[in-house]
UniProtKB/Swiss-Prot annotation:
It is found in: Membrane. It is a multi-pass membrane protein. Residues 183-231 form the TM2 domain. Belongs to the TM2 family. GO terms for cellular component: membrane. Its main location: membrane. Keywords: Glycoprotein, Membrane, Signal, Transmembrane, Transmembrane helix. The chain crosses the membrane at residues 180-200, 216-236. Residues 26-179, 237-247 are extracellular. PANTHER family: BETA-AMYLOID BINDING PROTEIN-RELATED, TM2 DOMAIN-CONTAINING PROTEIN 3. This is TM2 domain-containing protein 3. Residues 201-215 are cytoplasmic.
Length: 247
């Protein structure tokens, strides 16, 4: 009986030692193999970030390249594609010549189709805001009244066209007369005033619905209001309600 109990105790001790050995071995293996796997992942992210950043920097194209023709004549390049040694000592209104170079990345040629680095351009000595209106475009306003006395002006920003050369900033402020149209025709308004003016059709067409209702319910002011409107529309005194000009 005693040997049997002793044998059971020995078996329990051996089983306990075996379990401890297995557990300690698994923990060692888990610690041993998990660290090398984490290390390469840790080292991988910085290199990927650097490669992506380098690639984005290398493929970035300057904004002016969109306006620059490829393999064109240097002297005909847009102003944004060249750098010129301008000066303000020239005589206003007189022809002047400046030395220029194409900007970085712009490839151009001379009249003989040979690559050219330095070239000259001829222009009139004047600042950009002194150019004729055909050489720049401005932001138009539709919030001002064209029919007013005195005639309204508004402040806007103008930009010189690519083919025009000038001194100073190519974007400048300017004050312009209010000049826009909403699509109303003077001939249509006059025809409606003559034919259907007694029903207020001319005023409704111009967007003046209050006056149109007044003419409609008074039968054109018994003809007097109709005659007055024909005269006012014919001379341009009565215009669209939105303040625009006739077409």
């Amino acid at each position: 009986m005693i040997p049997m109990m002793t044998l059971k105790r020995v078996c329990r001790v051996l089983l306990f030692i075996t379990q401890m050995y297995v557990l300690s071995g698994r923990g060692f293996l888990s610690f041993e193999y998990s660290e090398p796997v984490a290390q390469p992942l840790k080292d991988h992210f910085p290199s990927s970030t650097i490669a992506t950043s380098t690639k984005a920097t290398a493929t970035k194209i300057p904004d002016y390249m969109e306006k620059c023709p490829s393999n064109g004549q240097c002297s005909r390049l847009p102003s944004d594609c060249m750098t010129c040694a301008t000066n303000y000592s020239c005589i206003y209104g007189k022809p002047v010549t400046f030395n220029c170079t194409a900007k970085n990345g712009v490839v151009c040629f001379d009249v003989n189709s040979q690559p050219q680095e330095y070239f000259t351009i001829s222009m009139t000595c004047q600042f950009c805001w002194q150019l004729p209106p055909s050489d720049y475009v401005c932001n138009l306003s539709s919030s001002c009244k064209t029919v007013s006395c005195p005639r309204q002006r508004y402040n806007t920003t103008c930009t010189v066209l690519d083919h025009a050369h000038c001194l100073g900033n190519r974007t400048f402020p300017k004050m312009l007369y209010c000049n826009w149209t909403g699509g109303y025709k003077w001939s249509t308004a006059l025809a409606l005033s003559i034919t259907l003016g007694g029903f207020g059709a001319d005023r409704f067409y111009l967007g003046q619905w209050r006056e149109g209702l007044g003419k409609l319910f008074s039968f054109g002011g018994l003809g007097i209001w109709t005659l007055i409107d024909v005269f006012l529309i014919s001379v341009g005194y009565v215009g669209p309600a939105d303040g625009s000009l006739y077409i």
